[in-house]
């Protein structure tokens, strides 16, 4: 949502790093009392000299724990001996079992030097992580560790950012400190924290390094004066809790990461449909009109969304009684449900400090953040003066469940189908120190004035209820607590990370707030606020409907968020640069951070889109997993039906997306079961091809579909890279033999997007599209067989009831094609009336021996299509010769 109010606040420059090289001045540590077991190593680490106390007090006694957790995963943890220093709570990110591995069998090996202490992680004879270049620093408010890297490394990850997918390696700093970041600027910290990087070394494999630490940090990637490459961690606290994992390919490494942070949550079938939203729908009549207009334009609309416009003076858990009265809003939701469509609204964390149910209940239960003197902590957001829920409070889940149960009650409230949570970094418009939130709200017109009330809809909407037609009248630290050391400066730490907003507390919750429950400081847990709201919100949605998969889309995330929620990429703007960077962002979240329900605001959120940009973005957005058009109140309306070319582009885009929806659903389900990514950079499938390592403008949609969008305005061609393999044009069926070079694809109309099927694939598609996913599930299937260079192909299909958390029966099919024969086998538990009605074999120069009504040959597409009537009830085999 637009953050224009931030412009009213005084600007605070980004913090500047210290000028001296601390690692050379500090003594480091020496390892003693070293004990090695079958799958572990422990040691005491003692400060090796005079403390340097550069950005805090050097801790004299540390512990080292090394665990060979699996054959592909190594855990290395350096922490304080008294275990007072804050560690990420297991309630936020549960730890994986570390007892199954063996040092002898592990692909990763841990080596160390005792004095001064340093360590290396090796894979075979190759060094993956080497801290010998500088001394370990472990201070009360500053941790530093540096590792050497190979020359010109292929590094990825360290989100959230809008920089290149393959990270820069000279004078580059990634700052992790979640913030409200309008326009998602480059080279800054954004909404989420994902402290994991992947190092891809071509044919030697890929490894990942995850630092389980939620404190603010700078991660620097640079070269020394003599040209040696390094990566350096600079954190404001916490411990060094590393997970190293390795794989033969990038995909394998991503799978290993999922085992650490949790497998993604499965989503309902309908969530992959098209979604529409806008900040600025003035009333329920306008929302209804948008729904009606999509239907009239014959553009499928699965889910209608409403931003904070529906609220009474922007207060959560309220309705504007004049513009979104309960009775009319319930009528709209009923209309949507009767037409197999859905409805979603936004909920922010900040609760208005005023007489309303959310605030009154929260005060009664004491679940809001408090200052250290026990008074209510207040900020200023859209409704004006606000209080913030304390997600660590022992009663917070009950409070959140109760608010959802009352406001979103199916019989008496707003019966939403999914949830959108925003502003949960947490955002605070009032700059630090926010000593007068009341005055700030008054001076900045918070809440903003609502639009004039319309007594009825100004135009008729045939099919909608009468109400939508025109009216005739018009805790403190103790030893072993792991909650944080005492006597720290929680507002202005000695080391300042490069937070774009300036001081740590600026435009967010004060970092000296102490949470209820265990007594964690906001200083340590700031980056967890959004992900904890996500977990509580998912639980509250599930409490409403225990049997169905809850869709929750969040702005702020932390490592492991995908196990609970999806993510939209925040407040982008309507520019080609944001269109392009959305690809890299999507790939990082889906493949590297294990948050596969992902997408950006199609056509752009801020500013005014153009017809060409929106038409191109409609085609690209159809290949996000989360596909939503959304923009802000000061921009021109940009629903797809507003321009003829955009409407045509959207119809084409959704037609292909919906026909592919079961292919999407199948691959998405696989990721939730194994961690195998669905959306992938090119180098995930061609890990030995160096030309793919920095390609961030093409991507694979599953293993079978290569998408090569036009990425600049006024262009009708794209230079697309095709690895050494065979591909088939989605539209024409023409075979394209890739040679590891660029191919110019021309004459690409603004309503089109280049799509190619990778050889060796079998893709199940629906025989035709539909206006809703409910109707889509009634359509039959076709199989497209795209033989690989060896003449074989394979694919899969997963079906279930599309909604339930616990599935009573599933259909899991495997397709194989070899020597002219198609075989179908698998698990046939889920019953469906639809059949496989046709099989199309690409890459054929002559018709099949079959003739008549059974088979047909298309010489233009070089494809043979055979009509079938295969029930999905048991194994089958077809001769395609």
UniProtKB/Swiss-Prot annotation:
It catalyses: Hydrolysis of terminal, non-reducing (1->4)-linked alpha-D-glucose residues with release of alpha-D-glucose; Hydrolysis of terminal, non-reducing beta-D-glucosyl residues with release of beta-D-glucose. Its EC number is 3.2.1.20, 3.2.1.21. Pfam families: Gal_mutarotas_2, Glyco_hydro_31_2nd, Glyco_hydro_31_3rd. SUPFAM superfamilies: (Trans)glycosidases, Galactose mutarotase-like, Glycosyl hydrolase domain. Glycans are attached at residues 171, 293, 373, 506, 572, 608, 742. Residues 448-463 have a biased composition (Pro residues). Residues 1-14 form the signal peptide. Coiled coil: none annotated. It is an enzyme of class 3 (hydrolase). The keyword Signal applies. The active site is at 422 (nucleophile), 425, 571 (proton donor). Keywords: Carbohydrate metabolism, Cell wall biogenesis/degradation, Glycoprotein, Glycosidase, Hydrolase, Polysaccharide degradation, Secreted, Signal. Residues 440-485 are annotated as: Disordered. Its main location: secreted. One of its GO terms (cellular component) is extracellular region. InterPro entries: Gal_mutarotase_sf_dom, Glyco_hydro_31_AS, Glyco_hydro_31_C, Glyco_hydro_31_N_dom, Glyco_hydro_31_TIM, Glyco_hydro_b, Glycoside_hydrolase_SF. The keyword Transmembrane helix does not apply. GO terms for molecular function: alpha-1,4-glucosidase activity; beta-glucosidase activity; carbohydrate binding. It is found in: Secreted. Glucosidase involved in the degradation of cellulosic biomass. Has both alpha- and beta-glucosidase activity. Belongs to the glycosyl hydrolase 31 family. This is Probable alpha/beta-glucosidase agdC. It comes from Neosartorya fischeri (strain ATCC 1020 / DSM 3700 / CBS 544.65 / FGSC A1164 / JCM 1740 / NRRL 181 / WB 181) (Aspergillus fischerianus). The gene is agdC.
